[in-house]
Amino acid sequence: MEKIKEIIVVEGKDDLKRIKESFDCTVIETKGFALKIETIKLLKKALKYKGIIILTDSDKSGNIIRQKIVKYLGENNKIKHAYLNTKDTEVESVNKTEIIKILKGVGTLSKDNQKDLLKLSDLLELGIIGENSKENRQKIQKHFCLGDGNSKKLLERLNYFKIKKTDLKNQLALTNSPRRT
């Protein structure tokens, strides 16, 4: 499966599934009109790092969400826009071939070195996922501006931003060390 360098921004979880069927990539959902502060911070970070591709439904709602994202992030040449070919179409209902064609037209295909990527076992070992891990996971998500999400989303975002195991260890050591008064 081909990999896209930029983060792809979509409206909902069904859109995310449709994109993931076609590409190995990081996808962020806006979850509709109400963009959370965490989502905006994550998009700003992605914009500095590798850029984003906005792919929303081709209806009025999709255009409003697209405009909101640009408003919050500002005009930037690292914001790429992908558009569906048919008016009033939802991303989730577009066939895989069209999704591939659209995203290949605006995205940057890449080949990441898989050996340097974190694994779920690394996060488990560090106490970021698994039993009694919620506090550590939230500290990591907040410090690295990764937004909320389950274990798989966290892992995907850590790898997207090339955050290393040593970075995680160091941050946990800092945040978990007793404070002096």
UniProtKB/Swiss-Prot annotation:
Enzyme superclass (EC): hydrolase
Family as reported in the entry's similarity comment: Belongs to the ribonuclease M5 family.
Cofactor annotation remark: Binds two Mg(2+) per subunit.
One GO cellular component, as annotated: cytoplasm
PROSITE patterns: TOPRIM
Residues given in the record as Mg(2+) 1 binding sites: 11, 57
Function comment: Required for correct processing of both the 5' and 3' ends of 5S rRNA precursor. Cleaves both sides of a double-stranded region yielding mature 5S rRNA in one step.
Any one GO MF annotation of this record: ribonuclease M5 activity
One record GO biological process: rRNA processing
Localisation: Cytoplasm
Keyword field: Cytoplasm, Endonuclease, Hydrolase, Magnesium, Metal-binding, Nuclease, Ribosome biogenesis, RNA-binding, rRNA processing, rRNA-binding
Catalyzed chemical reaction(s): Endonucleolytic cleavage of RNA, removing 21 and 42 nucleotides, respectively, from the 5'- and 3'-termini of a 5S-rRNA precursor
E.C. no: 3.1.26.8
InterPro entries: RNase_M5, RNase_M5_C, TOPRIM_dom, TOPRIM_RNase_M5-like
rRNA-binding keyword on record: yes
Cofactor: Mg(2+)
PANTHER family the record matches: DNA PRIMASE (BACTERIAL TYPE) AND SMALL PRIMASE-LIKE PROTEINS, RIBONUCLEASE M5
Pfam family, one: Toprim
Organism: Borreliella burgdorferi (strain ATCC 35210 / DSM 4680 / CIP 102532 / B31) (Borrelia burgdorferi)
Domain Toprim per the UniProt entry, residue ranges: 5-88
HAMAP family the UniProt entry points to: RNase_M5 (MF_01469)
Main location: cytoplasm
Protein name: Ribonuclease M5
Binding site for Mg(2+) 2: 57, 59
